[in-house]
């Protein structure tokens, strides 16, 4: 069973040090999962097609290693629903962008991924996406 924390909230964001501390806490209390989905990471949601730069990759790698050291599964969650094109005219390009993003994270050591399609402003679009 999964026992852990989802960092996927609105409000005051966690610092990198806060994240490392939370991962240590997870290990201390035998939680086994940390889901990275911070709303303040624009490359998680608003600019999801963009790859992380070297400095951002270094921080993610540090989180991944901290999780491994604490027996905590690191799950990278991506939230592309605001502008992912689910229609024929844009689907292939967006699917390729999604795979490029996941491939770049896989190279960093991420082995568990989540695709978040919640918090969409248009409930009709959210229903259409979930039914695919």
Task: Specify the residue positions occupied by each region the protein language model found.
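Feature activates predominantly on carbohydrate-active enzymes
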Residues: 1-111, 116-118
């Amino acid at each position: 069973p999964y026992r852990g924390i989802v960092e996927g909230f609105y409000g005051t964001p966690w610092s990198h040090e806060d994240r490392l501390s939370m991962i240590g806490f997870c290990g201390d209390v035998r939680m086994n999962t940390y889901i990275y989905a911070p709303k303040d990471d624009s490359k998680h949601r608003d600019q999801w097609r963009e790859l992380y730069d070297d400095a951002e990759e270094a921080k993610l790698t540090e989180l991944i290693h901290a999780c491994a050291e604490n027996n905590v599964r690191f799950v990278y969650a991506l939230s592309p629903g605001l502008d992912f094109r689910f229609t024929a005219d844009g689907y292939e390009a967006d699917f390729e962008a999604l795979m490029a993003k996941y491939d770049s994270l896989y190279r960093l050591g991420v082995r568990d991924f989540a695709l978040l399609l919640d918090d969409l402003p248009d409930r009709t679009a959210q229903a259409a996406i979930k039914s695919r």
